[in-house]
Amino acid sequence: MSEQRKPCKRGCIHTGVMLYGVLLQGAIPREYMISHQTDVRVNENRVNEQGCFLARKQMYDNSCGAASLLCAAKELGVDKIPQYKGSMSEMTRKSSLDLDNRCERDLYLITSGNYNPRIHKDNIADAGYSMPDKIVMATRLLGLNAYVVEESNIFSQVISFIYPDARDLLIGMGCNIVHQRDVLSSNQRVLEAVAVSFIGVPVGLHWVLCRPDGSYMDPAVGENYSCFSTMELGARRSNSNFIGYTKIGISIVITNEAL
């Protein structure tokens, strides 16, 4: 795994405040997205036949958390999704967990906090961002367990200072928060938050999928990569202004206890 870029100390607090506008929200600059409305069901069949890991390009600007969770759940053997009120699965009467727009949309409604019909937005593209507690909620609805890792660094400290409710929300739902991630087992996947840098300046945060073998899936590109550094290279190829990803020390470990 490549060496992580160290954030510039100058103005780091200001940068942290700016980043918190998209706190773990899965937000990534619009110009970085290659395509928004992408259905990859055909691609799913191809990668499954090859026995490879799954990849999914996010449908919406801020749905990287949902797209990453969808791939993680499929790789961990989940094949059903709840037909909750207002979901596309309910409307189509389908309960299979597929690598398609229906399932990403249904998960995104949960991870963005728009699953409640009273606050449901007419335009899902404007639904908002995937927050840690809502990702954990969606993970549990899929029958999986999750805990949050919050390593001690400038990013996590700024986030905790500006958004103290984040920890309380997780604790309130009985989600464990630890300060160090253990070695992953084959029945685990990780949704990892990274800072996105353009022209050397952190401009947003983004969720990516990490696996026990060290490989990654970047939903902004919709591709799998052997390691963190090759994922950065893939992102650079998609946008000449992109500089890199920086790990911020916050991640969600997802486990299928049945495996």
Curated annotation (Swiss-Prot):
Induction: Expression is temperature-independent.
Subcellular location: Secreted; Host cytoplasm
Transmembrane segments: none
GO function term, MF aspect, one: peptidase activity
First-listed, main subcellular location of the protein, grouped into a coarse class: secreted
UniProt record, GO biological process: proteolysis
Keywords, ordered alphabetically: Host cytoplasm, Hydrolase, Plasmid, Protease, Secreted, Virulence
Enzyme Commission numbers on file: 3.4.22.-
Gene ablation phenotype (knockout): Mutants are not compromised in their ability to invade cultured epithelial cells or to form plaques on BHK cell monolayers.
Active site: C64, H206, D218
Consequence the record notes for mutating H206A: Lack of activity
Presence of keyword DNA repair: no
Gene Ontology cellular component list: extracellular region; host cell cytoplasm
Function field: Virulence factor that eliminates N-myristoyl protein modifications in infected host cells. Could also cleave an array of N-myristoylated host proteins involved in cellular growth, signal transduction, autophagasome maturation and organelle function.
Protein name: Cysteine protease IpaJ
Organism: Shigella flexneri
